Amino acid sequence: VSRVALGMMSYGAPSALSWSLDRDRAEPIVRRAVEAGVTFFDTADMYGDGASEKVTGRLLRALFARRDDYVLATKVYYPMGPGPNDGGLSRKHIMSAVDASLTRLGTDHIDLYQVHRWDAETPIEETMAALDDLVRAGKVRYAGASLMYAWQFAKAQHAAERHGLTRFVSMQTRFNLLYREEEREMLPLCADQRVGVLPYSPLARGVLAATGPRDTDRAAAERGRSRLTDGDDAVIGALRAIAAERGLPPAQIAMAWTLAHPAVSASMVGATRTGHVDDAVAAVDVALTPEEKSRLEEHYRPRAPYGHT
């Protein structure tokens, strides 16, 4: 797959999210990504209550000549209706959810079907068996996971191995210069088990892309949720200093740092402008020196993990 994956959460539901784009506004951005060599696209059934999957499917069918020329990923877990079986990772929900996603995406298979969260209410053996059945049926090519604690991910992999079921091939998790808690256990676990890590939010929702005090809408929202601390200012300062020395946007330096981790296979990137795509693709070719990496990392202060539940 391409080392940049275009996250499709930003497309399909402008009425629900102020920063979401409709199909017409999303088309030139996705087209720019395709022209730049991006072949990996990630969405979820709950993004825009299914609207993102619909837009994703329509755009990719229009921009690619063959279905085999791109990798399509989506996710399952969050409620998609009011009923007791309309969410979670039970066999019943997974089996109905995958068919609904296939219909919205307009395809006969999903390349990477990811569980969006850990489901404490469903035995992991039931979840892994359902995913294995989807792979055997040809509806899904590979199974992936997202946002778990390392012990949960290890438990899932062990359950699959113990019962001869399909194992997860990927872990999508938060990882950037301002949130590095996954370096403790998850990234080493994935490296040891040869599982591809797919970091999302490499720019901390736009905070690391800013060149000055003016925030993006999502960066302002992040500050409003108290995710950022005063200690992050030193990291941001080092990032901007290195970017200035290189004559590059801070976004390229921040994404280059994420991509440089040996466990990372591809980075999930959201884009609401074509320039966001350009920065992400250019970051693939940015090689940071050991001294630059040290400067970017030395000011980090550990924090409590979040986002797994």
Residue spans for each PLM region:
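N-terminal small/glycine-rich loop or linker at the start of catalytic domains
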Residues: 1-17, 73-86, 109, 114
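Conserved beta-strand positions
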Residues: 6, 43, 74, 112-115, ...
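Short, acidic/polar
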Residues: 20-33, 88-105, 153-157
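Beta/alpha (TIM)-barrel catalytic core signal, keyed to glycine-rich beta->alpha loops juxtaposed to Asp/Glu
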Residues: 119-298
